Amino acid sequence: MGRVLVVDDDEVIRQLIAVNLTLEGFDVATAIDGQDCLDKVRAIDPDVITLDVMMPRLDGWETAVQLRKAPRTAHIKVVLITARAQEDDMTRGTNVGADAYLTKPFDPGEMIRVVRELAGAPPA
């Protein structure tokens, strides 16, 4: 179906997203923060990255910027999934190159729909 890299420092949320996407047929890998994402992204070559914003070492904002700057990763679709729900946060998400923005707590069905759409998978 497609390959997804799930990036979140909260293990429970990371596993929740990963399990839901795996059950939908996606090949899923995980990373614990933005730096881990950048370290793994070339080897994994995902179609979509779900990316938390508030993480240690390298936050989601800067991770998205770095992904967009690099020619080998600029094409990867990015879904920011964060507790930051203010309008200026959503604007910042657009400015750093996110393709979609979901706020926590999120509906797993909506998250799956967004990832499927960005990965070019047919609707369920």
Stretch-by-stretch model annotation:
Residues 15-23:
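Charged docking surfaces used in two-component/phosphorelay signaling
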Residues 25-32, 40:
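Short hydrophobic/Thr-rich beta-strand motif most characteristic of the beta2 strand and flanking loop
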Residues 44-50:
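Active-site beta3 strand of CheY-like receiver
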Residues 55, 78:
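Receiver (REC) domain active-site loop signature in two-component systems and cognate sites
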Residues 106-116:
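C-terminal output helix
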